[in-house]
From Swiss-Prot:
Top-level EC class: hydrolase
Main localization (coarse): cytoplasm
Organism expressing this protein natively: Legionella pneumophila (strain Lens)
Catalytic reactions of this protein: Hydrolysis of proteins to small peptides in the presence of ATP and magnesium. alpha-casein is the usual test substrate. In the absence of ATP, only oligopeptides shorter than five residues are hydrolyzed (such as succinyl-Leu-Tyr-|-NHMec, and Leu-Tyr-Leu-|-Tyr-Trp, in which cleavage of the -Tyr-|-Leu- and -Tyr-|-Trp bonds also occurs)
Protein name per its UniProtKB record: ATP-dependent Clp protease proteolytic subunit
Taxonomic placement: Bacteria, Pseudomonadati, Pseudomonadota, Gammaproteobacteria, Legionellales
Length: 214
């Protein structure tokens, strides 16, 4: 989609492969991410922030408009980032009609771990050497004592909301999620599956349900 490849190019220091396709009207070139978008694959790469979240949301809505019945695959390699940006993606994933299948490649930490576990039931995956990390939201504010108190209450409210969301998708209680996220909690792919963040560790494409003609 317009603007998406520009963001990827910036993050990859200008290095991005191009794909050349033969059509009845001659050759057509795509950047690799736009080509994969045609296969209903979205990449969530790098820090979760407002600009990236807007691009992911736009792609989810576009693919729903293209075919509201066909699954969308969300590939995640992210250290996390801004909570509100992550929740914008989360709400859109839950809002649209197609199932969103999630796959962790590399890492899914913090807000990215929340998005990983928010995939459709039975369609949440990790590759075997991926790492997943969950923790409580980070907060830091300077200012008058009253303002600090206001932001502290907001941070606690956000934490409760995130705990409830993760509890819903992992089938655990919010209290257990709160205990398990007191500090950075790192997991292997297998541990993430046992915890309920994902449904399966993928060792082979044939069982992934992510196969394409590429």
């Amino acid at each position: 989609m317009p603007g998406y490849s520009d963001n990827i190019i910036r993050n990859a220091s200008g290095l991005i492969p191009m794909v050349i396709e033969q059509t009845s009207r001659g050759e057509r070139s795509y950047d690799i991410y736009s080509r994969l978008l045609k296969e209903r694959i979205i990449f969530l790469l790098g820090e979760v922030e407002d600009h990236m979240a807007n691009l992911v949301v736009a792609q989810l809505l576009f693919l729903e408009s293209e075919n509201p019945e066909k699954d969308i695959s969300l590939y995640i390699n992210s250290p996390g980032g801004v909570v509100t940006a992550g929740l914008a993606i989360y709400d859109t994933m839950q809002f649209i009609k197609p199932d969103v299948s999630t796959l962790c490649i590399g890492q899914a930490a913090s807000a990215a771990a929340l998005l990983l576990c928010a995939g459709a039931d039975g369609k949440r995956f990790c590759l075997p050497n991926s790492r997943v990390m969950i923790h409580q939201p980070l907060g830091g504010y300077r200012g008058q004592a009253t303002d600090i108190e206001i932001h502290a209450r907001e941070t606690l409210a956000v934490r409760e909301r995130l705990n409830n969301i993760m509890a819903k998708h992992t089938k655990k209680t919010p209290d257990q999620i709160m205990r398990d996220t007191e500090r950075d909690n790192f997991m292997s792919a297998t541990q993430a599956m046992e915890y309920g963040l994902i449904d399966k560790v993928l060792y082979d494409r044939q069982i992934a349900g992510h196969s394409t003609d590429l």
